[in-house]
């Protein structure tokens, strides 16, 4: 049994997009929560190309004497997950906690995530209790969660909640993945050996409106499916095989009916044409599926994701262990 790695410093990464109204309260509550920790801390707020005064507010907070805040300013809007990855590239902590800027997930939950992560967990996920979102957002979130679980095989209760904690080696592994479209919770689970989910509170949004419109949710769904799995490509072969088998069975049925009950049961060969058409359509889908397999392999190679991830090497030779983990 391995000894849990000590957490000497905690980094908080918060993506910000047009949240100038909530920023003062967000920073106050986050600092207050981090002061309860037994470890050092830093708070990285990543401005994702905001069109309001969010960048100015963050800059002023970061320049204040004795501030624990680090402002990372992006030149334009790249999206929530890209902004978080930008924050990851600047963290210095042993444990990294991500948090949304809308205060719907209370920063007061941070000490609990750190406490759970200290029990030798690589990733600590969260499940929102008594969600305060609209009916549409709840239904959309459930559909996306179900779709992700079916297509990726990663069973988690709430993919949409960004209040999560990651060990430093998980962050380093994700930074070695250079694909442009990614979904951090699933990517982290790809490298995690030990994960857990805990329930957290969920509050109503006090400032502004949600930045996820209907079209952004639809785009997110497509990004999730296409950037994390090649299952849709393989489904072409499955559907094609089913159509071809259906057409073949239909043709056998028509031949049997014609032989035993007369030609009128086969509609003078018209139904047989449909059966043959089904077989050809199925064959086309199978061909597209095979082509998709090759495209999927090219896609996986282009992403340049590590073939494997070694969390640690236990050896009596410290030098050997160091070389293996580089």
UniProtKB/Swiss-Prot annotation:
TM stretches of this protein: 235-255, 270-290
CDD domains for the chain: DPM1_like_bac (cd04187)
GO biological process: 4-amino-4-deoxy-alpha-L-arabinopyranosyl undecaprenyl phosphate biosynthetic process; lipid A biosynthetic process; lipopolysaccharide biosynthetic process; response to antibiotic
GO cellular component, one term: plasma membrane
Enzyme category, top tier: transferase
InterPro entries xref list: ArnC_tfrase (IPR022857), Glyco_trans_2-like (IPR001173), Glycosyltransferase_2 (IPR050256), Nucleotide-diphossugar_trans (IPR029044)
Membrane topology: Multi-pass membrane protein
Gene3D superfamilies named among the record's database cross-references: Spore Coat Polysaccharide Biosynthesis Protein SpsA, Chain A
Compartment list: Cell inner membrane
Reactions mediated catalytically: UDP-4-deoxy-4-formamido-beta-L-arabinose + di-trans,octa-cis-undecaprenyl phosphate = 4-deoxy-4-formamido-alpha-L-arabinopyranosyl di-trans,octa-cis-undecaprenyl phosphate + UDP
Pathway: Glycolipid biosynthesis; 4-amino-4-deoxy-alpha-L-arabinose undecaprenyl phosphate biosynthesis; 4-amino-4-deoxy-alpha-L-arabinose undecaprenyl phosphate from UDP-4-deoxy-4-formamido-beta-L-arabinose and undecaprenyl phosphate: step 1/2; Bacterial outer membrane biogenesis; lipopolysaccharide biosynthesis
A GO MF term: undecaprenyl-phosphate 4-deoxy-4-formamido-L-arabinose transferase activity
Matches recorded under Pfam families: Glycos_transf_2
EC number: 2.4.2.53
SUPFAM superfamilies: Nucleotide-diphospho-sugar transferases (SSF53448)
UniProt entry keywords in alphabetical sequence: Antibiotic resistance, Cell inner membrane, Cell membrane, Glycosyltransferase, Lipid A biosynthesis, Lipid biosynthesis, Lipid metabolism, Lipopolysaccharide biosynthesis, Membrane, Transferase, Transmembrane, Transmembrane helix
Family membership noted in the UniProt record: Belongs to the glycosyltransferase 2 family.
Role summary: Catalyzes the transfer of 4-deoxy-4-formamido-L-arabinose from UDP to undecaprenyl phosphate. The modified arabinose is attached to lipid A and is required for resistance to polymyxin and cationic antimicrobial peptides.
Protein name in the entry: Undecaprenyl-phosphate 4-deoxy-4-formamido-L-arabinose transferase
Protein species of origin: Sodalis glossinidius (strain morsitans)
Name of the gene encoding the protein in the UniProt record: arnC
């Amino acid at each position: 049994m391995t000894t849990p790695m000590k957490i000497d410093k905690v980094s908080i990464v918060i993506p910000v997009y047009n949240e100038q109204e909530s920023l003062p309260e967000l920073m106050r509550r986050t600092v207050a929560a981090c002061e309860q920790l037994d470890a050092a801390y830093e708070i990285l707020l990543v401005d994702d190309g905001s069109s309001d005064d969010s960048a100015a507010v963050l800059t002023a907070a970061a320049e204040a004497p004795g501030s624990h805040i680090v402002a990372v300013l992006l030149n334009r809007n790249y999206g929530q997950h890209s902004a978080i990855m930008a924050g990851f590239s600047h963290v210095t902590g042993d444990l990294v906690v991500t948090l949304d800027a809308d205060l719907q997930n209370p920063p007061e939950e941070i000490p609990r995530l750190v406490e759970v992560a200290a029990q030798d967990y690589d990733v600590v996920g969260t499940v929102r209790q008594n969600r305060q979102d609209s009916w549409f957002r709840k239904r959309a979130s459930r559909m996306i969660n179900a779709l992700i679980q079916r297509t990726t095989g990663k069973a988690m209760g709430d993919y949409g909640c960004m209040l999560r904690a990651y060990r430093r080696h998980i962050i380093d592994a994700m930074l070695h993945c250079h694909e442009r479209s990614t979904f951090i919770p699933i990517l982290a689970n790809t490298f995690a050996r030990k994960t857990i989910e805990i329930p957290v509170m969920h509050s109503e949004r006090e400032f502004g409106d949600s930045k996820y419109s209907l079209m952004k949710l639809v785009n997110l769904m497509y990004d999730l499916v296409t950037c994390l799995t090649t299952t849709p490509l393989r489904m072409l072969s499955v559907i094609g095989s089913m159509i071809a088998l259906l057409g073949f069975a239909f043709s056998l049925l028509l031949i049997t009916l014609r032989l035993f009950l007369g030609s009128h049961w086969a509609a003078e060969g018209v139904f047989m044409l449909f059966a043959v058409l089904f077989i050809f359509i199925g064959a086309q889908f199978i061909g597209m599926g095979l082509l998709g397999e090759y495209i999927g392999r090219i896609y996986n190679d282009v992403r340049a994701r590590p073939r494997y991830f070694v969390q640690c090497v236990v050896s009596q030779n410290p030098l050997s262990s160091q070389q293996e983990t580089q």
